[in-house]
């Protein structure tokens, strides 16, 4: 049996036609889904025979809520979701003045091996389908009772390691027949799989591309990100310049600041020289504490100096505001803790 959420409207129309149903029933079905109705039986404007046929051939792959944590400030909600096969992922809703943003997962676990990230501990279990990625937004919207208007593909998993499902998901949520979320309200974060960035460029999307750089030289990057053994920083920067020229979009470079690893003035100068003249922005992220590592965030004064050094190279940077620290809102932390508790560790 298939997850009907893996179908877009055009595909479901084809299925309806092939199975003797009126094609407009596909739109009716998705109207119910996008308005928070996740049971065939409750879709009252679909004939009973249609509902029964759908139920016989499909299931609505909506995850169940394992855990919901609300931050004390009320600006962050973190969910642990369980899919039909028992696999667990997490997503985070962040509430801003301009609307609600959601950070979603694209894989169960991750195989990229970045040493500062909890998501990669235990490796990659499997890819999420386009429908399973979509379901995170639909379920979160229903849980909080508010619309989500911004999407960040920055949860567990490497989006470009699950390329086809992620691209299909983006096109579904961007479609007027889907959630109608503008492409410029969607950010895709990657550790830098160069061939896939070129593929993404050819999709001609207007999403924001965010590169998890986290170092300004290959030697340092190799210590914290295994992907650096495959693609050098110079290859990534060259690729990003071409991507930006082709799409006209500014690139975001993410840089996790780790005390005594990549937070010194020399690292900031190298980063400034590397990105000078590019249409880009740097997002500085004081590293989150992960029990399995000894990494610590630098002092505030050192973070500010790093920022000031980049400014000398005319590179705009922001220091990411910490949200949901009291609920383990950083990528992979809650899932990891839950798995360890379940295993009695």
UniProtKB/Swiss-Prot annotation:
Q: Which cofactors does the annotated protein need, by name?
A: [4Fe-4S] cluster
The catalytic residues are 90, 331
A molecular function (GO) held by this record is: 4 iron, 4 sulfur cluster binding
User: Which Gene Ontology BP terms does the record give?
Assistant: rRNA base methylation; tRNA methylation
- Catalytic EC class: transferase
Where located? Cytoplasm
Identify the InterPro entries for this entry: Aldolase_TIM, Elp3/MiaA/NifB-like_rSAM, Methyltransferase_A, RlmN_N, RNA_MTrfase_RlmN, rRNA_lsu_MTrfase_RlmN/Cfr, rSAM
* Coiled-coil residue windows: none
- Known EC number: 2.1.1.192
What are the UniProt keywords, alphabetically? 4Fe-4S, Cytoplasm, Disulfide bond, Iron, Iron-sulfur, Metal-binding, Methyltransferase, rRNA processing, S-adenosyl-L-methionine, Transferase, tRNA processing
Q: Which SMART domains match?
A: Elp3
Q: Which residues form the Radical SAM core domain?
A: 96-326
Cofactor binding note = Binds 1 [4Fe-4S] cluster. The cluster is coordinated with 3 cysteines and an exchangeable S-adenosyl-L-methionine.
Q: Which residues bind S-adenosyl-L-methionine?
A: 157-158, 189, 212-214, 288
Cysteines joined through disulfide linkages: 103-331
Q: Which residues bind [4Fe-4S] cluster?
A: 110, 114, 117
Entry-linked CDD domains: Radical_SAM
Note the Pfam families from the entry: Radical_SAM, RlmN_N
Q: Tell me if Acetylation is a UniProt keyword of this record.
A: no
Q: Does the keyword Electron transport apply?
A: no
Catalytic activity reads:
adenosine(2503) in 23S rRNA + 2 reduced [2Fe-2S]-[ferredoxin] + 2 S-adenosyl-L-methionine = 2-methyladenosine(2503) in 23S rRNA + 5'-deoxyadenosine + L-methionine + 2 oxidized [2Fe-2S]-[ferredoxin] + S-adenosyl-L-homocysteine; adenosine(37) in tRNA + 2 reduced [2Fe-2S]-[ferredoxin] + 2 S-adenosyl-L-methionine = 2-methyladenosine(37) in tRNA + 5'-deoxyadenosine + L-methionine + 2 oxidized [2Fe-2S]-[ferredoxin] + S-adenosyl-L-homocysteine
Role noted for this protein: Specifically methylates position 2 of adenine 2503 in 23S rRNA and position 2 of adenine 37 in tRNAs.
Miscellaneous note, as given in the UniProt record, is: Reaction proceeds by a ping-pong mechanism involving intermediate methylation of a conserved cysteine residue.
Family according to the record: Belongs to the radical SAM superfamily. RlmN family.
Stated name of the protein: Probable dual-specificity RNA methyltransferase RlmN
**Which species is this record about?**
Clostridium acetobutylicum (strain ATCC 824 / DSM 792 / JCM 1419 / IAM 19013 / LMG 5710 / NBRC 13948 / NRRL B-527 / VKM B-1787 / 2291 / W)
What gene does this protein come from? rlmN
């Amino acid at each position: 049996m298939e997850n009907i959420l893996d179908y877009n409207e055009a595909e479901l129309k084809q299925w309806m036609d092939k199975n003797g149903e009126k094609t407009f029933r596909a739109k009716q079905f998705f109207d119910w889904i996008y308005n928070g109705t996740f049971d065939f039986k409750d879709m009252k404007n679909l004939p009973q025979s249609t509902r029964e046929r759908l139920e016989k051939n499909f299931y609505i792959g909506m995850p169940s809520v394992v855990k919901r944590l609300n931050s004390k400030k009320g600006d962050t909600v973190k969910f642990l979701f369980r899919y039909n096969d028992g696999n667990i992922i997490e997503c985070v809703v962040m509430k801003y003045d301009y609307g609600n943003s959601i950070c979603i997962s694209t894989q169960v676990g991750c195989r990229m091996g970045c040493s500062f990230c909890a998501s990669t501990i235990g490796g990659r279990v499997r890819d999420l389908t386009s429908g399973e990625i979509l379901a995170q937004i639909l379920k979160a919207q229903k849980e909080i009772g508010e619309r989500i208007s911004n999407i960040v593909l920055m949860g567990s998993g490497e989006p470009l390691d699950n390329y086809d499902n992620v691209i299909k998901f983006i096109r579904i949520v961007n479609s007027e027949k889907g959630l109608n979320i503008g492409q410029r309200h969607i950010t895709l974060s990657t550790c830098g799989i160069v061939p896939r960035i070129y593929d993404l460029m050819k999709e001609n999307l207007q999403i924001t591309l965010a590169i998890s750089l986290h170092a300004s030289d290959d030697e340092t990057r190799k210590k914290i990100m295994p992907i650096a053994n495959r693609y050098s920083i110079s290859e990534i920067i060259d690729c990003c310049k071409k991507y930006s020229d082709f799409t006209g979009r500014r690139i975001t470079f993410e840089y996790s600041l780790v005390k005594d690893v990549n937070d010194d003035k020399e690292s900031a100068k190298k980063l400034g020289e590397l990105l000078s003249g590019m249409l880009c922005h740097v997002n500085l992220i004081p590293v989150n504490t992960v029990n399995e590592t000894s990494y610590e965030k630098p002092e505030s004064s050192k973070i500010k100096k790093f920022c000031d050094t980049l400014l000398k190279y005319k590179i705009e940077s922001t220091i990411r505001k910490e949200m949901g620290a009291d609920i383990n809102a950083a990528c992979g932390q809650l899932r990891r803790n839950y798995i360890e508790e379940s295993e009695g560790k």
